[in-house]
């Protein structure tokens, strides 16, 4: 989870995409 957050780079759009991908994963 923390690793995914780091990948988001604090981007709002990226955060949403990362959440969707990690939720689907």
Curated annotation (Swiss-Prot):
Q: In which pathway does it act?
A: Energy metabolism; oxidative phosphorylation
Q: What is its EC number?
A: 7.1.1.9
**Single GO molecular-function term?**
cytochrome-c oxidase activity
Swiss-Prot/TrEMBL catalytic activity: 4 Fe(II)-[cytochrome c] + O2 + 8 H(+)(in) = 4 Fe(III)-[cytochrome c] + 2 H2O + 4 H(+)(out)
Among the entry's GO cellular component annotations, what is one? plasma membrane
Keywords of the record, alphabetical order, are: Cell inner membrane, Cell membrane, Copper, Electron transport, Heme, Hydrogen ion transport, Ion transport, Iron, Membrane, Metal-binding, Respiratory chain, Translocase, Transmembrane, Transport
Cofactor requirement: Cu(2+); heme
Q: Where in the cell is it found?
A: Cell inner membrane
The biological processes this protein is annotated with in GO are: oxidative phosphorylation
The cofactor remark states: Binds 1 copper B ion per subunit.
Enzyme kind, highest EC tier: translocase
Q: Say where the protein is mainly found.
A: membrane
Q: How does it sit in the membrane?
A: Multi-pass membrane protein
Question: What does the sequence similarity comment in the record state about its family?
Answer: Belongs to the heme-copper respiratory oxidase family.
Protein name according to UniProt:
Cytochrome c oxidase subunit 1
Q: Which organism is it from?
A: Paracoccus versutus
What gene does this protein come from? ctaD
